[in-house]
Amino acid sequence: MKLVNFLKKLRNEQVTIELKNGTTVWGTLQSVSPQMNAILTDVKLTLPQPRLNKLNSNGIAMASLYLTGGQQPTASDNIASLQYINIRGNTIRQIILPDSLNLDSLLVDQKQLNSLRRSGQIANDPSKKRRRDFGAPANKRPRRGL
């Protein structure tokens, strides 16, 4: 299963996204595009701490936050609340999933599962008995006693 298809199944989950510039975004994941662009709502945006060796690199992030209509964060905590954010896929460093997420059910690929059901390798309904043995060829009919 591709990573993007897995992320598409995480709709309405609370995730934390860390960006390549050090910004941390926490919010509810609404959708993920094939290019891994993520749309989040009810967002808390934490800007990275300014470094002394760079000239006001945090100012650019603050200016873009101001232009989008977000609330101006205080200088001490660098946290802003936004209603909506669209994150470009190539700026994402990592996506942190919640601990309560059931990964086993999300990692099942329905297309692959349906193709295995059609080929007869797995049963459609777990309550039904299998009609043929594993060792017998699939194209032969079962023998009936005379």
Curated annotation (Swiss-Prot):
GO molecular function, one term: RNA binding
Region annotated Disordered, chain positions: 118-146
Main localization category: nucleus
InterPro entries according to UniProt: LSm4/Sm_D1/D3 (IPR027141), LSM_dom_sf (IPR010920), Sm (IPR047575), Sm_dom_euk/arc (IPR001163)
SUPFAM superfamilies (alphabetical): Sm-like ribonucleoproteins
GO cellular component annotations of the record: catalytic step 2 spliceosome; commitment complex; cytoplasm; cytosol; nucleus; pICln-Sm protein complex; precatalytic spliceosome; Prp19 complex
Domain Sm: 2-101
Subcellular location: Nucleus; Cytoplasm
Gene3D superfamilies: 2.30.30.100
Gene Ontology annotations of biological process type: 7-methylguanosine cap hypermethylation; mRNA 5'-splice site recognition; mRNA splicing, via spliceosome; spliceosomal complex assembly; spliceosomal snRNP assembly; U2-type prespliceosome assembly
One Pfam family per UniProt: LSM
Sequence motif Nuclear localization signal, residues: 128-144
PROSITE patterns: SM
Alphabetized UniProt keyword annotations: Cytoplasm, mRNA processing, mRNA splicing, Nucleus, Ribonucleoprotein, RNA-binding
Organism domain of life: Eukaryota
Assembly notes: Component of the Sm core complex, present in spliceosomal snRNP U1, U2, U4/U6 and U5. The core complex contains SMB1, SMD1, SMD2, SMD3, SME1, SMX3 and SMX2 (Sm proteins B, D1, D2, D3, E, F and G, respectively), and is probably a heptameric ring structure.
Family, per entry: Belongs to the snRNP core protein family.
Cited function: lays a role in pre-mRNA splicing as a core component of the spliceosomal U1, U2, U4 and U5 small nuclear ribonucleoproteins (snRNPs), the building blocks of the spliceosome. Also binds telomerase RNA and is required for its accumulation.
Further information: Present with 2400 molecules/cell in log phase SD medium.
Domain comment (free text): C-terminal extension may function as a nuclear localization signal (NLS).
Protein name: Small nuclear ribonucleoprotein Sm D1
Designated gene of the protein: SMD1
